[in-house]
């Protein structure tokens, strides 16, 4: 985990210092600033990690994510946001899925960029998200180098598909366990998080698993069962409703969003990651499993011919919703999240697996979501966890509609009608979202440029006023 900032103009070291201070939580172990011909770059990083910068006759670079060190080989679908200065030109690149965050804006017509929006607010105008799968060169502008698109399924038998998926996931997890004796894994007791925890356990001496929820939440029960089954060192955070209200301002500040469904999940993610930081510097997180293997309920309503395209679209939407949540929760506490379902080898295989293996039904039975993933790990997990239906993070943790109910006590119908129109002309969906937006503006002001705020597909909403 690290954080980068920069500007495509010389003589701006003081500005870069100011921007780095806004994202200092992303790296408390070290800081470097490079003022070169063509611009100024800055990076903060965690203690103990390999410093994420290079400075040699071939060029200067700072990055967040995984980088080989070769600027000519920077195009990747592994986590990476990189900025480099070479020959007086600034080069920027973001990974193909948007796992590592990057944003940009303008200062007097000059490009400025940062890992988080908060470093740009008050500095830049026209703040936008740097698009995943793009690179930028100051002399030529933006250019797309990667885009995930629907592909033809490979002619795989069920057993072969399950075996290949198991191997790909084992290798994806091993990338992060290699050389370690201890690592963490978020564990909700659902299929995705349980899979990563079970795969990681034999690869390390000590696996710490982390679950959180309100007393009696189903996630806690399922997570305990899985933790006992795989023999992990299990930790729990049990919270009450006041804890949710109290943590909201911090969550929204780090998340940089007011999207209601995203914040619901982010609260529980934030609380569990706080616990991670007490034990290990990094933990696996199960994002990507639902999008790759058809885990969401609405997929069952789609025509089979449309399902593959919607799965690809779902993966391409993750950069400013689920992946943003994972990154901000981890960075808030100086930890790192490993999303092994989105490892390049896993994604490449998954998009070629026939969709009928993902939503699979026997005879006239209801289709089972993520069926091929369940088959790939059926020997690893207890039966209850293996066949547990999909539950949203905030539902399984016991949050359910408590946040929406709380918002109704804070915001009147008249308030909602008067305040739901945003400065950019769009509308807030619910009173819950207005509650979050009010907190958002307390942190960041009444921004007119809100293009960087991702919105969850299928979020509940009321009709827009005429």
Labelled PLM ranges:
Residues 215-273, 298-309, 328-331, 352-363, ...:
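ATP-dependent adenylate-handling ligase core
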Residues 294-296:
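Short, solvent-exposed loop/turn and secondary-structure capping segments
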Residues 1-254:
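Cysteine-centered catalytic environments shared across enzyme families
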Residues 166, 170, 174, 201, ...:
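Amphipathic, well-packed alpha-helical segments that form the structural scaffold of globular domains
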Residues 1-4, 278-285, 291, 304-466:
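Adenosyl-5′-phosphate
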